[in-house]
Amino acid sequence: MANVVENLGKLERRVTISLPKETVQKEIDARIQKLAKNVRMPGFRPGKVPLKMVAQQYAGQVEAEVLSDKIGQEFFTISRAENLRVAGQPSFAPKQEQSDDAYAFDATFEVYPEVKIGDLSTAEVERSTTTIGDAEIDRTLDILRKQRVHFHARGEAGEHGDGGADTAAQNGDRVTVDFVGKIDDVAFPGGTAEDFPFVLGEGRMLPEFEQAALGLKAGESRTFELKFPDDYHGKDVAGKTAQFTVTMKKVEWPHLPEIDAEFAKSLGIEDGDLAKMRNEIKENLEREAKRRTQAIVKNQVMDALLKISELDVPKALIEQDQQRLVEMARQDLAQRGVPNAKDAPIPAEMFAEQAERRVKLGLVLAELVKANGLEAKPEQIRAEVDEFAKSYEDPKEVVRWYYSNQQRLAEMEAFVVESNVVDFVLGKAKVTDKEVSFEALASASAQA
């Protein structure tokens, strides 16, 4: 007999599942007999409990298990027979009207939508490009020098000098201070510290605090007022005015290493050749620029695909992805050391919009890949693994690391598929190239 699939909406469907009671009862009896071989009850040896007593004890539980299994099996059979592409998990409910010879259940579920992708030639994508020159290399060298800064006491002679005759604290100096803060003459938590170090000009402290420390020499003190911002993270003091006294304990000036052979060696250039060092920095920056431009253009391509695509999104898939995002958020909290992160009360609703976009995009990409043969080829995956491995000290070990784990390899395969989609769309869309600086590129990729 043909199965009647009711259309309840755009994607929602319902089908009736009928299970002959005789068939169900046979399975219940078989399971109870099997269960009886191991059941333990007071006064009976294992396996010797009368079958009637086992049935009285476990019949309800076994019946529920059998019905659940049979319903699932029958639904699978029907969905295959009717070519139903079921999205998510179906829900089952007993029908109000039951016959004497069969159990009847309604299975309610959603199906995957038809995905209509519009004309790719109408899609508009802006592709960022950047050129790595001497200015970008010099800026990187400056950052690397600052990462290797050494501090020396002002006024004390050493191998790098004494930092000048002026021993007062200046911007860029590392200072060590004691401070006491009070509000209405009462000390408050976090308002007092001893031997507290920070670098002037880095913005770690509030502006009024840094300004008060500027110009002080070791042993000098200064009293000043400081108004905490209204949005200050310490709610007890936010918006309030405190009186601080800061005492300078130590003033140290920064010494940046010279860009010489020793500096190059510290960056891994064995012979200390400065030209090699600059060339390696350039190659690293170009790899980073490529990675960032790819990420930005990928987001633009995905946005463009969503704009020209028409489809209904199964609610079941959105709900599943919401739960997935909740678990990811909890894992992130756990990695940050938050106590009881796995039980954090994170509402799934906060991920509704993000989940809908992710599911919709996944359906569009699946359709595009299938229709245009954009699956990842083994040689493409290997090329991406090799490219990724180049930025590490031992590329061969990184390659082995990838190929030793199917999950890692699957992640790279997904990356290649996305790259294939991006290249395919760029070959058909209206693409505008835009030259941007490396700094602007970094800022844009951070916001993407």
Curated annotation (Swiss-Prot):
Cell division listed as a keyword: yes
As for subcellular location, the record says: Cytoplasm
Q: Which Pfam families match?
A: FKBP_C, Trigger_C, Trigger_N
Q: Which residues form the PPIase FKBP-type domain?
A: 172-257
GO MF entries? peptidyl-prolyl cis-trans isomerase activity; protein folding chaperone; ribosome binding
Cite the entry's keywords alphabetically: Cell cycle, Cell division, Chaperone, Cytoplasm, Isomerase, Rotamase
Q: What Gene3D superfamilies does UniProt report for this protein, alphabetically?
A: 3.10.50.40, Trigger factor ribosome-binding domain, Trigger factor, C-terminal domain
Biological process, per Gene Ontology: 'de novo' cotranslational protein folding; cell division; chaperone-mediated protein folding; protein transport; protein unfolding
**Main EC class of this protein?**
isomerase
Reaction(s) catalysed by this chain, per the record, are: [protein]-peptidylproline (omega=180) = [protein]-peptidylproline (omega=0)
Predominantly, its location class is cytoplasm
Q: Which PROSITE patterns match?
A: FKBP_PPIASE
A single GO CC term for this protein reads:
cytoplasm
UniProt keyword Iron-sulfur present: no
Q: Quote the SUPFAM superfamilies the UniProt record gives.
A: FKBP-like, Triger factor/SurA peptide-binding domain-like, Trigger factor ribosome-binding domain
- According to its UniProt record, the EC number is 5.2.1.8
Which InterPro entries does the protein's record reference? PPIase_dom_sf, PPIase_FKBP_dom, Trig_fac, Trigger_fac_C, Trigger_fac_C_sf, Trigger_fac_ribosome-bd_bac, Trigger_fac_ribosome-bd_sf, Trigger_fact/SurA_dom_sf
Please give the NCBIfam families that the UniProt record associates with this protein: tig (TIGR00115)
What is this protein for, i.e. what is its function?
Involved in protein export. Acts as a chaperone by maintaining the newly synthesized protein in an open conformation. Functions as a peptidyl-prolyl cis-trans isomerase.
Q: Tell me its family.
A: Belongs to the FKBP-type PPIase family. Tig subfamily.
**According to its record, what is known about the domains?**
Consists of 3 domains; the N-terminus binds the ribosome, the middle domain has PPIase activity, while the C-terminus has intrinsic chaperone activity on its own.
Name the record gives this protein:
Trigger factor
Query: Gene behind this chain?
Result: tig
